[in-house]
Amino acid sequence: MTYGTNDKWNRHDCYCGKKGCIETYLSGPGLSKHYYDLHKKNLDAKIIQENANNGDDQALEFINEYLDYLARGLAQVINIIDPGAIVLGGGVSNMKQIYGNINSKLKKYVFSDTVNTQILKNKFGDSSGVRGAA
């Protein structure tokens, strides 16, 4: 799924060959690439999250911007399908900042005045996708 933007988060080609794919900026590797682009520090997503948890202003600002992009992507699903819940998976879904802040950000991008879709953390950790495919 693409989210065509002309801003600083739309710099990297996706492995599928397109530009603007959600994977290129919402995945852990995408998050790390964008952090490097902005701050010239090569940190993985887990370290960026730890820095934010420890009050690092640069990491906090970056995570806040990341959450805005996550909200844009989730809003596309909500606007089209209107699911009762969306369960997030993968390593980045372990970011505690997501679950406390995403609903206020979603309100900027959904068509409705309210957001009734629950954004949930998976129950089985990073192996949730594998379990779901089984």
Predicted region positions:
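ATP-binding/phosphotransfer module of carbohydrate and carboxylate kinases, centering on a glycine-rich
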Residues: 5-134
